[in-house]
């Protein structure tokens, strides 16, 4: 399975912070935002990853992340000239996906919870159909919304409905089989002129090939697209790290745990990791 991180957009809700900086490189407590979706893919066992961003911001991601070899993964890059909807990621990334199943994750989404790795790896094992994740929210009109029957089987999906049929939001994490490229290529723009990922999910639902996994109590899904939500995410991560003395979304640690790099390679990274708390943490692990 291959992964795509969509890290485009202009981040207008975070102006002036994002006037010259990509939203996905802003810090969420002690590390760049993009480390969180990156490590989510790594926890799913995904090692081939495409990062999609704007022409202006692309050099920043390349300087920050490189080719991924330091973490035992392969990173490639592609440009999204203008933000025309989430499903556009599969038009831009068609050659990269090249007939493989894939996972798309939004670059400003953070996931955390006991058992998350198991859910991710289960979804990553799919060969047919699609798996998306639903999360209970207080403001469903801001999201794609999934309607369930009494048995928690998906009945419908709507994008930012004025009158939501449920309080279950579709999160920014999607697992698809190889058919997604053709589905995305044949979409028509929505009323707001975008290629909607909700339309992709709806097609899988109509074909009887959509699984919706519920992230219930004990899971956190954080969207960091506004100043308040960015601060809340940073406070959440800080609390976890201070209370339990571990790092959240540390790619070096995840790479070691997943067997992507050896103990010796990890130790070399830790030696070069600087004098701050992050480097000290890596050296303690080494």
From Swiss-Prot:
EC supergroup of this enzyme: transferase
GO biological process terms held by the UniProt record: biosynthetic process
Reaction(s) catalysed (UniProt annotation): dTTP + alpha-D-glucose 1-phosphate + H(+) = dTDP-alpha-D-glucose + diphosphate
A GO MF label: glucose-1-phosphate thymidylyltransferase activity
UniProt: Mg(2+) binding residues: 108, 223
Keywords assigned by UniProt, alphabetized: Magnesium, Metal-binding, Nucleotidyltransferase, Plasmid, Transferase
Co-factor: note: Binds 1 Mg(2+) ion per subunit.
Pfam families registered for this protein in UniProt: NTP_transferase (PF00483)
InterPro entries: G1P_thy_trans_s, NTP_transferase_dom, Nucleotide-diphossugar_trans
Enzyme Commission numbers on file: 2.7.7.24
Cofactors named for this entry: Mg(2+)
NCBIfam families xrefs: rmlA
Oligomeric form and interacting partners: Homotetramer.
Protein family (similarity comment): Belongs to the glucose-1-phosphate thymidylyltransferase family.
PANTHER family: GLUCOSE-1-PHOSPHATE THYMIDYLYLTRANSFERASE, GLUCOSE-1-PHOSPHATE THYMIDYLYLTRANSFERASE 1
Function according to Swiss-Prot or TrEMBL: Catalyzes the formation of dTDP-glucose, from dTTP and glucose 1-phosphate, as well as its pyrophosphorolysis.
The name this protein goes by in its record: Probable glucose-1-phosphate thymidylyltransferase
Annotated source species: Sinorhizobium fredii (strain NBRC 101917 / NGR234)
């Amino acid at each position: 399975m291959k992964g795509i991180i969509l890290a485009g957009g202009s981040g207008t809700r975070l102006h002036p912070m994002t006037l010259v900086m990509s939203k996905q490189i802003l810090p969420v407590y002690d590390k760049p935002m993009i480390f969180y979706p990156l490590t989510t893919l790594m926890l799913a066992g995904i090692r081939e990853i495409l990062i999609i961003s704007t022409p202006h911001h692309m050099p920043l991601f390349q300087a920050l992340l490189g080719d991924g070899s330091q973490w035992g993964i392969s990173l490639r890059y592609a440009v999204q000239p203008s933000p025309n909807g989430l499903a556009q990621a599969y038009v831009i990334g068609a050659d990269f996906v090249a007939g493989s199943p894939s996972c798309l994750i939004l670059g400003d989404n953070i996931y955390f919870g006991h058992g998350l790795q198991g859910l991710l790896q289960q979804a990553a094992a799919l060969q047919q159909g699609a798996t998306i994740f639903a999360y209970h929210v207080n403001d469903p009109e801001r999201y794609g919304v999934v309607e369930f029957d009494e048995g928690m089987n998906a009945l419908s999906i709507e994008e930012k409905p004025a009158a939501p049929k449920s309080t279950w939001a579709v999160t920014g994490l999607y697992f698809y089989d190889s058919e997604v490229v053709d589905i995305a290529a044949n979409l028509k723009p929505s009323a707001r002129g975008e290629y909607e990922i909700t339309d992709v999910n709806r097609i899988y639902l109509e074909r009887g090939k959509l699984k919706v996994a519920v992230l219930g109590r004990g899971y956190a899904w954080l969207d960091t697209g506004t100043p308040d939500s960015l601060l809340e995410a940073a406070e959440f991560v800080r609390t976890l790290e201070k209370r339990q003395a571990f790092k959240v979304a540390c790619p070096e640690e995840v790479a070691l745990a997943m067997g992507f790099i050896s103990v010796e390679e990890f130790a070399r990274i830790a030696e070069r990791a600087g004098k701050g708390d992050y480097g000290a943490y890596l050296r303690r692990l080494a």
